[in-house]
Amino acid sequence: MACWKSLLALGALMLGGGCTNAIAADPPGIDGAALLQALDDEYRAEATYAAVIEKFGGARPFINIIEAERRHASRAKTEMDRLGLSYEASNPYLGKIEAPATLLAACEQGVTAEIENIALYDRLLPTIQDDDVRETLGRLQWASRERHLPAFQRCVSRGGQMGQGRGGGRHGRN
């Protein structure tokens, strides 16, 4: 029943996606549905990158970006708390996603995932009514576009080889 109600809200956003595991019991409204979609995307990214780290060790950029994904999920949860929305507090995808066969394939998958994430926010942001939600989702999109996507593209250009140094991009944390 909760999935059906949430699909109505998500349908209003014309997302065309399936039911997420981070679903509120009541229809969350446009902003809430967008936050649920964002949280689900952050959870999936974290679980994917955790699988890559488990398989390949502390491979960059995954070791850096997984921490960013956790911060992003926390930001989405903070907004959902402010709006009084229910959500799955822990990541339901951890341990359920398999890492690609090679680090290069994982980096290529990261590029695709970040491009899809940017497109998700391109669809969501014009529908947002709450200024704080818009700012939060805009920052998450910025991190995907300006930090995560370039990091995965560099990984692909190196043939999946890990980079040197501590990371953090050119300007620090995201």
Show the residue positions of the predicted features.
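Bacterial N-terminal signal peptides that target proteins for export
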Residues: 1-8
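All-alpha RGS (Regulator of G-protein Signaling) helical domain and cognate RGS-like helical scaffolds
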Residues: 25-174
